[in-house]
């Protein structure tokens, strides 16, 4: 007789840049959470759905927890903390190569107040010596009674099958919330805007990245050629940032568009014509109505 089907929700939390999105994308096998080496890349809860014949795990990739500097930062931390209460299991991801930091201490204090089981995932184990890993495990074991401590490499996939096995063991009997072939509950527009924002994050520097929102103005399909025309606007806070994103003779914007188009075509499996505009909206991160316009709705979180 076959085992009953299990399902549950798992939150992935940790300081910015510890590899949370890399882990989610490795498990799901398709890029759905944007990755960059700049902190605070993930803004909205991105849900990845991992389904096998035995179970379904719905992953929530929260923003990196940090002390907020503005309304958007405050909003991002609020999402992460609220998530702790809503899920069946928490993955607390740390970066083995940087060791214990004050940001980790901040998160552990929050985790001690929740009833949800917590797995400590020590990521980037390929970057440290085994004896340093053992010391790190002991250090964290003294700080909190974790349900499991699992060393992994999200980038290379080391020990990820074991992590999924342990996760399944912690799930309750439950329904299949999403169809078997669905990997995220975000609409295509959201993922397209995130893929464009990823290229802005990777290609620009300094103050520009965190001052960027991307709005998809329209998507049209040509019925004859099946080609998609996507119109997008990149929102920045200052005209100097607009200049950086457009670049000399429009070269930077061209690069952003070209790289984003390839990612979007890979995601959608069809040819895309991508048109991008850049618009200045002063201090949008501190204005509640702009946050809502650009997809950050407090009510949903």
From Swiss-Prot:
It is found in: Cytoplasm; Cell membrane. Gene3D superfamilies: 3.30.300.20, P-loop containing nucleotide triphosphate hydrolases (3.40.50.300). Residues 40-44 are annotated as: G2. GTP binds at residues 14-21, 61-65, 123-126. Pfam families: KH_2, MMR_HSR1. Residues 204-282 form the KH type-2 domain. It comes from the Bacteria. Residues 152-154 are annotated as: G5. Belongs to the TRAFAC class TrmE-Era-EngA-EngB-Septin-like GTPase superfamily. Era GTPase family. GO terms for biological process: ribosomal small subunit assembly. It is a peripheral membrane protein. Residues 61-64 are annotated as: G3. InterPro entries: G_ERA_dom (IPR030388), GTP-bd (IPR006073), GTPase_Era-like (IPR005662), KH_dom-like_a/b (IPR015946), KH_dom_type_2 (IPR004044), KH_sf_prok-type (IPR009019), P-loop_NTPase (IPR027417), Small_GTP-bd (IPR005225). An essential GTPase that binds both GDP and GTP, with rapid nucleotide exchange. Plays a role in 16S rRNA processing and 30S ribosomal subunit biogenesis and possibly also in cell cycle regulation and energy metabolism. Transmembrane segments: none annotated. GO terms for cellular component: cytosol; plasma membrane. One of its GO terms (molecular function) is small ribosomal subunit rRNA binding. NCBIfam families: era, PRK00089.1, small_GTP. Residues 6-173 form the Era-type G domain. Residues 123-126 are annotated as: G4. This is GTPase Era. Monomer. Keywords: Cell membrane, Cytoplasm, GTP-binding, Membrane, Nucleotide-binding, Ribosome biogenesis, RNA-binding, rRNA-binding. Residues 14-21 are annotated as: G1.
